[in-house]
Amino acid sequence: MLIFTVFISLFISSFPLSQGAINHSEKNTFVEGQSIYLVSDEHPYYNLLTSPLACWYTDKDQSLQPLLLVQGQTVSARQQDFISKFTSDSTIISIGFTPKNYAVDQTFVGSPLLLSYQLAKDYFPKSDKALILPIDEIIDTYTLALLSTPLASYLHMPILLYNPNQQQHQQLFLTLESLNASSIYAVGSKIPSQFQDSYKLIHMKNTQDIQELMLSAIQNQFKKINYVTLTNPKDVSPLNLLDENNESIQIPIQHTSLYVLGKKFVLSGSDTVTKKITIPQGIHKYSTKITMKEITSVFPNDGSTPVFLSATLTDPNGRTISYGHSPGYRTNATYIETLITNHSGEYTLTISLFYGYRGGYFSLRGVSDVKTILEIDQHMQTLNDAHYPLISDLSQNAAYLTSAHGGIMIADEKFSLTDETYLEIADHHSTGPWYDETLQEYNNEKVNFIISRLQKNLSLLKNHDLYNGYVNGSGWLALLGDTNMIPMYYYPSNQTHLAERGLPSDNPYSLNHSLSPGRVISYTASDTSLLIARTLFYEQVCGPPTPEDEWHRKFNFVFGEGFGETGGFFHQIPYANKLESYGFLTTVYGDLRNSRQAAERLNVYTDTNYVEYLGHGDWFWFTPSIYGFNSIGQSIGAVQVRS
């Protein structure tokens, strides 16, 4: 066996796997009955109103309950699975909607403005203080409200909304009267004049006022901070549509192919089809979904046969501008999308299909046989500007995520890559910086701007004796946004033979490795909220780690060839040694080209909770065994995780 292993066997029976229950101070975690909040994604303020209900702190107690963002009034199967595993006697509460497919115990519906008064009365019969947030249709207003929402959790007070463009606020003052409130924390530059006359007023006019008050509350409540969330509030804004067109066509494809001694022999038909697409002048978001229909093959059609369906879109100059592969999307389907800015002409969509078994490395061999219909659904949205979130509404999760970790938030629509300046720079371009290196300079300027904003906000921590503990300790930085809303930095690469350009990285956000940055994203904002819930309540859902079930604390390190050995010896082995002091069971594997089947038999990738891999591969799939007749059938892709 040519696999290289280093076993570190120090055993410690208990260790923290996650930060599940909030424990930012020595308070007791107090839960008055288990509740799960299902929140509509149709308006971002529903999530803001619910956050201080699901997460709150007092001088002696604290409470954290799951909050799940629901897309389109339908509770997903994965969300239902989480609910069933969380606890059997939870009270299920929906905010802002009535689920179409799931029975709940209590429902609160209505506009965010009116709902804020109802929730305050129901959850805070008496409160000497309240957080008053503005609500209108302007992103700047939402930004201020989003930034200040964690304060309601830290000071355990209700959120009440007001429209700064209206003169009458009778319902607001009636609610304050019923709460018996004496102090109000008001956000916004135009607040009702009655606040000054009738209450002790703490006025937060701008983002700096909010951050200073937030940091004071954190210092008083927790004495430390180890979490900051970066997000872009503009991701709740829809595309600025000028026109929209859909087209669906079906193209038959059939082929039988053999792979012998590394060469492909097409015995019948063709494994590739092309389609010409005419793009007019203007700004367009173009997307295509390709799905296989009515599959006929000598191989089973029960999901067990490996399928590689890929699509490549090239511009009029023949340059790749978008690529999709079924292992990264769905079984029997793939998807591509791109932003085209004033680059009209004839584009080419190329679709390739493999359906069968294939393996080997130096001597590729295999067979593919399929007859199917490719359904091509094209969607072209003509836009007035370049605003283009890849994953909409992620910022809706920011308040709850931040509050659960006792942190602060940094939010600004100026973090967007696809702004007005980008539209000028990307004129006559058909893709983003990932395929076009000429766009990377502006992309990196935007990253540096975000970093400067991060540093400016972190400097405020010094005024509250929180700075050193954050940047010199285990400070976490959550990047809650896609790479158009919070772009990655592109390092230069000499791999010019690849269609992709540069090496994207979030490392600059670490501030020279003084912070631990990570993207908190999934396919949708709803999926992301579920990811957050699974993380916060990991032990409650999966059970606490026990000596009998060591899977919880196993951490496997794998390094491959092609300079992967350097990372294995100088990073992974020392890091594994460090982790053992926290109770992890660690093993370091050197995965050579001809040892992958051995790694598979040793369950290197499956019999462990954590895996760190240094080697070649794609983000969306990995082949643990590159030899054997069916190596691609043994691959693990994002599609398996998703389904």
Residue ranges and their predicted role:
Residues M1-A21, Y46, L144:
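Secretory targeting signatures
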Residues Q19-K27, A499-R501, N512:
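N-terminal intrinsically disordered, low-complexity tails enriched in polar/charged
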Residues G20-T274, P280, T296, G303-D315, ...:
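Alpha-helical transmembrane segments and their helix-helix packing motifs
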